[in-house]
Each structure stands twice: as structure tokens, then as C-alpha cells.
Amino acid sequence: LAVNPDIEVLIECIGGSSGPAYKLVKAALNNKKHIITANKALLAIHGNELIKIAKKNDVTINYEAAIAGGIPVVKAIRENLKYNNISKVYGILNGTCNYILSRMEREGKDFLSVLKDAQKLGFAEIDPTFDIKGIDATHKITLLSSLAFDIPIKFSQTYTEGIDKIELDDFRFASEFGYKIKLLGIAERKQNSYEQRVHPCLIREDSEVAKVNNELNA
């Protein structure tokens, strides 16, 4: 596929940040083929290298499906918002975590019980580590940050905290003060630097983000 002269665009659906996906995409770019992928792990780990190869060979890497489900956020930043001096990007970037937090709050069920339900319904993987530890959301926010601020991808420098330590008492305390708990990915332009982080946040109940529940992103 990577060397076939009849192929102009390669769609990568293998997944994973290394192994065959990385080798195939790298080889295809070096052979002047455009790439379409939803593989945020691959881009978060190897994106800087792959983007450099793509530019050298005058081809593109397109990854709209890698971030925020059906929300066309990559296109919006690339074509419009990027030129408006973005100072901050934040949002709910992992539907599994949002589903678990929503049900814990609404039904008073503990984390492990809701996680098992999410796995049965297909909202969580058999091995949910990337989701519940915040790694999936970190892949996404580092890509968004790179787009929004035109900086290199900095996955390894992003603070990451998941939802696996959230307890029911946390929701009770948050509710008493008018807050909800959401796992957010946040990228922010500081005076002389950029900050990227993923962690559970207290969100005002009347905010738009607080109203996004279940498996939805925002």
C-alpha cells in the first residue's frame, strides 16, 4: 500500500501508537501519499515527526475523526479560529468518562458499578485504562493545542489525571456548592508559555459544559 503508485490517499484504521500503523503511515508519507486517520495515539506520540515528513513531501495528514466524535473541531480551528488568536481551548473530550461521571452523579452508583455497565453497553473498552486514566483525552488535547497555538505536539509534557479516584462523596460536596464534576482537557496560552492538562474539574451547574451528559463530548 505504501509504495503502490496507483494509491494517492491512505486511510489508516489499524490503531495504536507504534507497530504496523506507525510504519505504514511513515512509509506512505515518504512515498507522497496523503493520510486520513482517527488514530490520536499515533499522532500524539509521533505527530511531530510525521507532520515534518508530510510537509517535506507536500502531502497532508487529516484526522478530524480523532477528536471529539462528530464535532468538526479540527476543521474549525484549521480554517477559521486559528487566525483569531485563540487564548484557551477546553472541553469534554472523552465520552466514556463523561458517561461514567453522569451516571454516578444522577444515580448515586459507585465508579466500578457504572464502569461495568459502560463496558456491557459498549461505551467502555474491555481494558478501559486509556479512558479512565485520562490518557485518551490527553492525546486529544495535545493535538488541539498544537493546532490552536501552532506549536509542536507535547503529549509527554501534559499533566494527566483520570476519574478512577472520584467517589460519590465528591459529587455530594460539589452539588452543595452548585457545581458538577467533569473530566476536561484544557490548553491555555500563558504570557510566555503554554499549559496543557487533563483532570476532573468543578464546573458551575449553569454553564453550558455542565449540561453535556452521558457519552457526549463538548
Task: List the predicted regions and their residue ranges.
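Long, structured protein-protein interaction/assembly regions in large complexes
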Residues: 215-218
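Rossmann-like NAD(P)H-binding beta-loop-alpha module
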Residues: 55-129, 135-136, 143
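A structured beta-alpha segment of the ubiquitous adenosine-cofactor-binding alpha/beta core
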Residues: 1-18
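Rossmann-fold NAD(P)-binding glycine/threonine-rich loop
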Residues: 16-31, 38-79
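Generic structural signal for well-ordered, non-membrane alpha-helical segments
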Residues: 21, 43, 47, 70, ...
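Substrate-binding/catalytic subdomain of NAD(P)-dependent oxidoreductase enzymes
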Residues: 113-211
